[in-house]
From Swiss-Prot:
Gene that this sequence comes from: aspS
Family in the record: Belongs to the class-II aminoacyl-tRNA synthetase family. Type 1 subfamily.
Entry binding sites for L-aspartate: E183, R229, H457, R504
Listed SUPFAM superfamilies: Class II aaRS and biotin synthetases, GAD domain-like, Nucleic acid-binding proteins
Pfam family, one: GAD
Protein name per the record: Aspartate--tRNA ligase
Length: 601
């Protein structure tokens, strides 16, 4: 390697930072040849590094015999170049390039490495299948989209650390090898060689450890942490993902929400130049479910669910009247301009809602020139139809869809339909951001399949002040479990939950009662959470916290379609890494050391 190259590694210039003020200066650059054009005696090379692209010009009369080296350059060759920065002629200015008014005229060129022809175009405007990009992830990094998202990810996390450091938070790493407590998703298990037939679990969250840190007096903790869940994957799920995990001592829910609002406002402004207005709006869990059919409502558009049970309870349409009589509900969602929806589309919606949400049917009415029209409107009095139209604010050209069933089925099915139809009829404005707190969650939810109470968030969530009397005895708790609310809160952005948390239980007595109502007996509680329960007896302060999904936030803020778009080396929806080809078999010797024998599948 020529001496001028090694001497200039630390003195290099960055392509994207060059400008006209450096005209006449000698420039040293390192990077990859993105494009090249041979025009006979003059070769133009678009040299790309992490910061951008600059045009370098190789002229035969200046390079002499070295010009033959420039003729060998091909796509993605690794180059070292030295030359003089000059302004381009007016006719050769490229307004689409950040450095389109300048170029570097070469006096030295070295090919540091050659490259095979890439299996796909690295031009950001060319479409490439996700499978191919995941297999050759190292090439995808050279494309503008992924590279820029990785840089934004770095800036985002750096801004978080900087802000929290100023707010007296301490970053502490919690264990990756942990105890299995399979309360939610499946754990990833790691066999212990030194302790045969014993297993570690990769953490689904640092929940217990951060509470232990509060007992230990650390008071303000945060961590950018990897978490692991062995679950079926969707667009916004990965087996390993990154959270901003936080915990505070001696705080109320109000103080936590205020602290988080300051953090979010600051990092959105610093990294994405997005100006947010704080405090964020708040909505109760009950309102979210009743009006939007979701605990993470997208509030960028209307189409609320409207309860018309009182209007239709005495109508002649038995599907509606019967649902109300049996303790259910009837709701309607009005779709602006939806009268163009075809019967075939309605049949498809009906089948989908039946399959995925157990909805028994999907009644509908169109708002025509004479009011509401449908095959079922003859079963309603004129006043009833007018009252339905008034309740949901329908006008000519709109379509009304009805759900009539148990309240939970109606809310979930119409909530899902609302989201699907918004894509066509009430598409949110591009770059619009709506952030809302969802508060006053139920503490428990009834599991119909297992006939038991489950924690809506997790077993360590504190009851609200209004619900504390329910915990005076197990008898009162059994009677009122369905009415107990929690000091829990979720932060929702554009219909996606980006963070959530709660005030924690710091009383051993209340924690024991929560375990009991969840069907966790004393022995099981001690086995799974014994060290936390013991810690609560050594002066646990009032504390609470939350966790943000870093990947989800970045997906939304960078316009990604999936969190795979903002993770450096993501897995597919089958949990595979196409680049490294993992998971993979291991040698028999390794299994023997772990005392593991494989079962045939």
């Amino acid at each position: 390697m020529k001496h001028w190259i090694q001497e200039n590694y630390k003195n290099r210039s960055w392509a994207g930072e060059l400008n006209e003020s450096q005209e006449g200066k000698q420039i040293v650059l390192f990077g990859w040849s993105f494009r090249f054009r041979d025009q006979g005696g003059v070769i133009f090379i678009d040299l790309r590094d992490r910061t951008g692209i600059i045009q370098v010009v190789a002229r035969k009369e200046l390079l002499g015999d070295s010009f033959t080296l420039a003729e060998k350059v091909r796509s993605e060759y690794v180059l070292a170049v030295r030359g003089t920065l000059k302004k381009r002629d007016l006719e050769s200015i490229n307004p689409r390039m950040q450095t389109g008014t300048i170029e570097v005229v070469l006096d030295q060129l070295e090919i540091l490495n050659v490259a095979k022809t890439p299996p796909f175009s690295l031009d950001e405007f060319d479409e490439v299948s996700e499978e191919l990009k995941l297999k050759y992830r190292y090439l995808d990094f050279r494309r503008e989209e992924l590279k820029n998202r990785m840089i934004k990810r770095h800036e985002f996390i750096f801004a978080i650390r900087n802000y929290l450091n100023k707010r007296k938070f301490v970053e502490i790493e919690t264990p990756i090898l942990n105890k299995s407590t399979p309360e939610g998703a499946r754990d990833f298990l790691v066999p212990s060689r030194l302790n045969p037939n014993q297993f570690y679990a990769l953490p689904q969250s640092p929940q217990i450890f951060k509470q232990i840190l509060m007992v230990g007096g650390m008071e303000r903790y945060f961590q950018i942490v990897k978490c692991f869940r062995d679950e079926d994957l969707r667009a916004d799920r990965q087996p390993e993902f990154t959270q901003l995990d936080m915990e505070f001592s001696f705080v109320s829910q109000e103080e936590i929400l205020s602290e988080i609002e300051g953090l979010v406002e600051t990092i959105y402004k610093e990294v994405f130049n997005i100006q947010l207005s704080i405090p964020f709006p708040r909505m109760t869990y009950n309102t979210a479910m009743e009006e939007y059919g979701s605990d993470k409502p997208d509030l960028r558009f209307g189409m609320k669910l409207v309860d018309v049970s009182e209007i239709v309870k005495d109508c002649d349409f038995n599907v509606f009247a019967g649902a109300v009589k049996n303790g259910g509900t009837v709701k309607v969602v009005c779709v602006p301009g939806g009268s163009i929806i075809s019967r075939k589309e309605i049949e498809d919606y009906t089948a989908w809602l039946n399959r995925d949400y157990k909805a028994k049917g999907l009644a509908y009415m169109k708002h025509g020139t004479e009011g509401l029209e449908s095959t079922i409107t003859k079963r309603f009095k004129k006043e009833e139809l007018e009252a339905i139209s008034k309740a949901c604010g329908s006008k000519e050209g709109d379509m009304l869809f009805f759900g009539a069933d148990e309240r939970e089925i109606v809310n979930h099915s119409l909530g899902a339909l609302r989201l699907k139809l918004s894509e066509r009829f009430e598409t949110p404005k591009e770059n619009e951001i709506n952030i809302t707190w969802i508060v006053d969650f139920p503490m428990f939810e009834w599991n119909k399949d297992h006939k038991r109470w489950d924690a809506l968030h997790h077993p360590f969530t504190s009851p609200s002040d209004e619900s504390i009397p329910f915990f005076e005895s197990m008898e009162t708790l059994q009677k009122n479990a369905g009415n107990a609310t929690a000091k829990a809160y979720d932060l929702v952005m554009n219909g996606v939950e980006i963070g959530g948390g709660s005030i924690r239980i710091h009383s051993r007595e209340i924690q024991n009662k929560v375990f009991q109502i969840l069907g966790i007996n004393e022995e099981e509680a001690k086995e799974k959470f014994g060290f936390l329960l013991e810690a609560l007896e050594f002066g646990a302060p009032p504390h609470g916290g939350l966790a943000f999904g870093i990947d989800r936030m970045l997906m939304l803020l960078t316009g990604g379609k999936s969190i795979r778009d903002v993770i450096a080396f993501p897995k597919t929806q089958k949990g595979l890494c196409l680049m490294s080809e993992c998971p993979s078999p291991v040698e028999e010797k390794q299994l023997q050391e772990l005392k593991i024998k494989l079962a045939k599948v």
